[in-house]
Amino acid sequence: MARRPDLKTGPERLAALVRTTVPPMHPAGLPFVGASLAVALAGRKSRWLRNAGVASAAANAAFFRHPPRTPPTRPGVVVAPADGLICLIEDELPPAELELPAVPLPRISIFLSLFDAHVQRAPLAGEVVAVEHRPGLFGSAELAAASADNERNSVVIRSPEGAEVIAVQIAGLLARRIVCNVKSGDKVGLGDTYGLIRYGSRLDTYLPAGSDVLVEVGQRAVAGETVLAELP
């Protein structure tokens, strides 16, 4: 005779429901959510302050959400390093600070709005062979000039087969803080979280020459899942 499932009740059931329906939050968001809740607590006698603090905490929790993702299993693919809208696909020189050969490479740019999840994920499985930060401006990340002018952080990942993919975090008008949690020598899996940009930004992905680009401008990308290209 089949047994009935052991359904949790009360607080345990509520906690389980929250875990399955609410995405986890990136640790970088904890100070912002905590500060907002502190404002709500300190101003609990003021309806305006209390509501503003709770609303700010909810907005920050949503912004710093870190939803689980399932990377593709087929070999030889590059996945989107960020959620957002594919705004540019063109051939461009890689960032000069990486001191790579001055040869144009296919570049796919993804714009992250304020409402996208802002964690970045490894577009390729392999070893991090270079990480370079370059100060710059904080212009609109939607503009083509943002790749050259804005503050950026470049990460080069080399696959076991020798293919190299460059993921460039680019700050925007509201994004004034780039977080990168990897360094040269680190190993990353396809779709592993490696960084975050706060409040609106852009991700450029440089592919090896000869890669087969599988996306188009105007398409939405899902970090760690959307296949941008197949390696040559």
Curated annotation (Swiss-Prot):
Q: Where in the cell is it found?
A: Cell membrane
Q: Which reaction does it catalyse?
A: a 1,2-diacyl-sn-glycero-3-phospho-L-serine + H(+) = a 1,2-diacyl-sn-glycero-3-phosphoethanolamine + CO2
State how the cofactor is bound.
Binds 1 pyruvoyl group covalently per subunit.
State the Gene Ontology BP annotations: phosphatidylethanolamine biosynthetic process
**Cofactor(s) the record lists:** pyruvate
Subcellular location, principal: membrane
Q: Which residues carry this modification: Pyruvic acid (Ser)?
A: 201
The catalytic activity of this protein is classed by the Enzyme Commission as 4.1.1.65
Q: What pathway is this protein a component of?
A: Phospholipid metabolism; phosphatidylethanolamine biosynthesis; phosphatidylethanolamine from CDP-diacylglycerol: step 2/2
Does the UniProt entry include the keyword Lipid metabolism? yes
Q: Recorded GO terms, molecular function?
A: phosphatidylserine decarboxylase activity
Q: Which domain of life does the UniProt lineage start with?
A: Bacteria
This entry carries the following GO cellular component terms, namely: plasma membrane
Catalytic site positions: 201 (schiff-base intermediate with substrate)
Post-translational note:
Is synthesized initially as an inactive proenzyme. Formation of the active enzyme involves a self-maturation process in which the active site pyruvoyl group is generated from an internal serine residue via an autocatalytic post-translational modification. Two non-identical subunits are generated from the proenzyme in this reaction, and the pyruvate is formed at the N-terminus of the alpha chain, which is derived from the carboxyl end of the proenzyme.
Q: Where is this site: Cleavage (non-hydrolytic)?
A: 200-201
Q: InterPro entries per the record?
A: PS_Dcarbxylase, PSD-A
A Pfam family that this protein carries is PS_Dcarbxylase
Report if keyword Membrane is assigned. yes
UniProt record similarity statement? Belongs to the phosphatidylserine decarboxylase family. PSD-A subfamily.
Q: PANTHER family from the xrefs?
A: ARCHAETIDYLSERINE DECARBOXYLASE PROENZYME-RELATED
What does this gene product do?
Catalyzes the formation of phosphatidylethanolamine (PtdEtn) from phosphatidylserine (PtdSer).
Per UniProt, subunit arrangement is: Heterodimer of a large membrane-associated beta subunit and a small pyruvoyl-containing alpha subunit.
NCBIfam families attached here? PRK05305.1-3
HAMAP family the record matches: PS_decarb_PSD_A
Record's protein name:
Phosphatidylserine decarboxylase proenzyme
Q: Tell me which species this is from.
A: Mycolicibacterium gilvum (strain PYR-GCK)
